[in-house]
Amino acid sequence: MNNQIFSPKITAVIESLRKLPTIGKKSSQRLALYLLDKSPETAITIANSLLDAAENIKKCKYCQSLTEKDVCDICGSQNRDESKLCIIESMLDLVAIEEAGFFKGKYFVLNGRISPLDGIGPNELKLDILEQIIINREINEIILAISPTVEGETTAHFISQMIGKDIKISRIGFGVPFGGELEYLDQQTLIHAFNARTNIK
C-alpha cells in the first residue's frame, strides 16, 4: 500500500512503529489504524506512558538494568547473594531468570554482545563498570548466561579472559542450542541450563 494514501501524521505513526523489532510494514499499518481509528484513548495512554518512561527511566549504576532509581531493587536488596554474579545480555534475560525464581544472586546486564561488524565493542557493553564490580565485591562465582551465538561466544571469551581474580567462572549449557536466545527458553529448560552449567575457569 502506498504511503500517499495516508495523511502525513498517520504516515509518521506508521513509520515510527516500523522502527520496533519484528514490526514490518503491514503490522505497523494495522497497529496505527487500530490505535487511531478504533482506540484513540489507548493511543493517548500508550503515548503518555512512553513519554513518562523515556523521561524517567535510566540504567542502574551497578547492573545496568532499567530502573527509575540510581540503584535498582535487585542491586539494593540485602536478601540477594552478592557472592554470585550472573552476566546476561538483556533485560529480557533478567526477566526470564527472575520469573523462573531459582537464582538469588545479582546481575550485570550487557545490553548487547561484542560485534565488531555492528560497531559494538567492550566499551559499548560497559565492561569497565563490570570490571570495577568484580574488583570491589567479594564474588565467588560468575555465571555467564550468554546466548551461544557467534557474538555470544566472543563476548563470553572476552569476559572470561578479562577476569583476572581467582573467581570461579561457569557457563550455562544444557538445553540451549547454538544460536538460541536465552529469553525464548521455557522456565524448566532455563533451570536445567543453570544447574548443568560448566566451569570455564
From Swiss-Prot:
S-S bridge residues: none
InterPro entries found in the cross-reference section: DNA_Rcmb_RecR, Rcmb_RecR, Rcmb_RecR_Znf, TOPRIM_dom, TOPRIM_RecR
The entry's keywords: DNA damage, DNA recombination, DNA repair, Metal-binding, Zinc, Zinc-finger
GO molecular function, one term: zinc ion binding
Gene Ontology BP term (one): DNA repair
Positions of C4-type zinc fingers: 60-75
Stretches assigned to the Toprim domain: 83-177
Keyword Nucleus: no
Key word Ribosomal protein present: no
A Pfam family per the record: RecR_HhH
Family: Belongs to the RecR family.
Function as written in the Swiss-Prot or TrEMBL entry: May play a role in DNA repair. It seems to be involved in an RecBC-independent recombinational process of DNA repair. It may act with RecF and RecO.
Protein name per Swiss-Prot or TrEMBL: Recombination protein RecR
Organism encoding this protein: Francisella philomiragia subsp. philomiragia (strain ATCC 25017 / CCUG 19701 / FSC 153 / O#319-036)
Gene it is expressed from: recR
